[in-house]
Regions:
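Low-complexity, highly charged intrinsically disordered N-terminal segments
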Residues: 1-48
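A structural connector/turn signal
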Residues: 22, 68, 73-74
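Buried, small/hydrophobic-residue-enriched core segments of structured protein domains
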Residues: 37-40, 53, 58-67, 76-242
């Protein structure tokens, strides 16, 4: 059971295909786009084999729903790399090309899978050494390890969407993140107000360097004055390690 339900890759279809149905404007635009590319390659004398009848059938017979069955490993499941993650089955032999239309969007699963796998391997390593070097066991290990790998990944990815997807995968394994977009994505999609991850007050380099180096200690004291109880995080390398 993962934090995000049991239906695989739901996020992709809700976000990218709306209500999962095809409307006339969708494939009319696709047809114009394809014809334009066809002409650019100098093949204008040959009719472009656009599957107009197939798309029309999907609209007429299936009310725009795609005759496709998609099966996948439930979210949050740990599987070997040789395991099939997704299968796409066409349920109407008259539109056999439809499966490949979904290939690229389905492959987006590689990114959260990679993030989730990496954070899980790090978590396993942390658990191993917590048990070897501390007196924690059972729930104690579980509670402390949940906050030992914090997600600051927003600045290291290509877009807001990427940050949200990556964070959603990370918080399957850990509860600490500063990537708010990922928490909001998971909350919105799975319709919950539960807080799925957490953070603490923290400084950044600008809030330390603005005090200037001679007053770095004052900057740290100010942090403690502002947050006299609980945990805070302070960057220690703005000038030098104190």
């Amino acid at each position: 059971q993962s934090l995000y339900g049991n239906e695989p890759n739901q996020y992709l279809f809700t976000w990218r295909t709306g209500d999962n149905t095809l409307v006339l404007n969708d494939y009319s635009r696709a047809q114009r786009f394809a014809w334009y590319l066809w002409d650019q390659f100098g093949i204008g004398g040959t009719p472009y084999p656009f599957p107009y009848e197939g798309f029309q059938k999907i609209i007429d017979k299936y009310k725009g729903a795609l005759p496709i069955t998609i099966k996948a490993v439930p979210e949050g499941t740990s599987v070997k790399t040789s395991n099939v993650l997704i299968t796409v089955e066409n349920t109407d032999p008259e539109v056999p090309w439809l499966t490949n239309y979904l290939e690229s969007i389905l492959l987006q699963v590689w990114y959260p899978t990679t993030v989730g796998t990496l954070s899980r391997e790090i978590k396993k390593l942390l658990v191993t050494y917590l048990k070897k070097t501390t007196s924690y066991d059972g729930d104690g290990v579980k509670n402390i390890v949940s906050f030992m790998l914090h997600d600051f990944g927003f600045r290291g990815v290509s877009s807001v969407e990427s940050s949200a997807i990556g964070c959603s995968a990370h918080i399957v394994n850990f509860l600490g993140t500063d990537t708010v977009s990922g928490i909001l994505l998971a909350q919105d999609y799975y319709n919950t107000d539960n807080m799925l991850a957490f953070s603490i007050p923290a400084s950044e380099h600008s809030t330390i360097t603005s005090w200037t180096e001679p007053f770095e200690v004052k900057a740290m004291e100010n942090m403690l004055d502002q947050y006299p109880t609980g945990l805070v995080a302070c960057v220690s390398d703005s000038f030098d390690i104190i």
